[in-house]
Amino acid sequence: MVTSDRVYYDRMQAMRGLSSSDVAFPAYASRRRIPLVGKQMRIGRRSAARELQPEIDLAVPPIDPGISRLHAMLIAAPDGTWSVLDPGSANGTLVNGREIPTGDLVTLNEGDRINLGAWTVITMYRG
């Protein structure tokens, strides 16, 4: 499930010393359910110039300005579990409030929250 996270946004704004006029929290944000399929799913913003079309495309309104073109990747394990990896995004990726080091693979569980960008959260659900 992809949506916005006000608590994360407020925390990041305070940590970075920004005001809401620097990067405004969206007035609306739909909830998008995206089924996880295949061996990996890229998370980011599509770019025609770079011929990049991530499977979880966050270049839809409201567009989170903190999302990199290739921000993170979800990688499937043979047992059906998923892990997340940040390949070097500009603003980092958090799992359950903890920043994950670039290049580290973090196994995900039901209900885990992946925060990225200025306000985006992806919550992991089965089925």
Which stretches of residues belong to each language-model region?
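Intrinsically disordered, low-complexity acidic Ser/Thr-rich regulatory segments
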Residues: M1-P65, I122-G127
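Forkhead-associated
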Residues: R31, P35-R113, G117
